[in-house]
Structure formats: C-alpha cells, structure tokens
Amino acid sequence: MTSWTKRLAGAMAALALSVGIAAATEIRIVNEADYGGARAEAVVSSLMQPINPFVAGQAGNTTSIAQIGTGHSVNSSIEGHSSASLIAQEGTRNRAVQAIEGSNSALLLVQSGTSNNVLQASRGDNNFQLVGVSGSNNDVGYVQVGNNLAGVLDVRNSHNTTVVAFQTNQSRNFLMPTGISGLNNVAVVIVPGKMYVLPKR
C-alpha cells in the first residue's frame, strides 16, 4: 500500500477517534450481530456475482473510472493480479481513492452529491468492497486487512458524516452495517465486533 494511502487512512482514523473522545459520554455501541451474520453473507454474496469474472484466476487487473460533473478527483492503484478497481462519480467536488495490494480482489464505488471524500483500501487476497455515498460533506473510509473479506457500506443521503470501517480476519468475513444511511452530523467507527455511533460536536 502506498505511503499516501497510509497517510490518508491515518488521517481519517485520527478524525474519527478525535470525535469519539469529544463525545465519549454519548457513544452508542452496536453489537456485531446487528451488521454481520447470515443476512450480510447472503446479500453481499449476491452483489459479488457480477464481478466474479474480473477477479478469477491469473488474469490482468481491471480499472474503470467514470466521472460526470465538476472538479472530481480520483486515484486508483493496484498491486497484484486479477483485481478490479471500479469508480463511478457524479456531482461536484467529490474525491475518491482506491488501493489494492493483493490478488483476486475488487473495490467498487458509486458516489454522487457534493464534497464527499472516500478512501477504499484492501491488503490481502479475495477481498470485496462496495461503497455507496451521496449527500454532502461526508468522509468515508473502508480498510480491509486480511483474506476472504467482503462488505458493503451504504452511506447514501447523508450530510457532514464520517464513517470509518476496519475489517480484519478478526471480523466476520461478511460486513454490511445497517442504519448508516441518511445520517447527519455523526461519526461512525466500525471495528471487529463493534460499531460506535458518535455525535459530532
């Protein structure tokens, strides 16, 4: 994973943790059962089916970027084989970073709205991410470290919200947190086994 990706991931983690410290008395903890388990596995597995041909075997890598609107910024980096980086953006001043270090993995982003920032990073093999973002002034980071990890983040219709998800082999293999779309002025931190929802001050 490149140094700029590490710096961006660190910055987003620091932002989320600083919000958590400021609002520590108002933390809402959601158990793993609320966003993992059989339902997440069924939904995420069905979403993975269309991209399976791009991430099978020893094929080359695939990068696809589509942008409509004004002032968008995209960075995509793949180290490995048979991986796919797919980004679709529309709106104004949206920024996206995708980085894959490993093989047979896929990162997908569908983003619209205004002034949203998304970081997706995967280190390992056979990983999958799908992120949807709309609204304005949202910061979203999804970092996977491990193998055979898959998940979906739905942060649509949100405003001034920070969502940071860390998925490892200590997490369940399938991650699909619910209740993080349509949020306003909150920070959500997802770590193995827990999800913290914190109001921004």
Task: Describe every region a protein language model picked out.
Residues 2-7, 23-60, 137-201:
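Long terminal segments
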Residues 25-99, 103-108:
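N-terminal targeting and processing segments
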Residues 58-60, 69-71, 80-82, 90-93, ...:
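Parallel beta-helix/beta-solenoid
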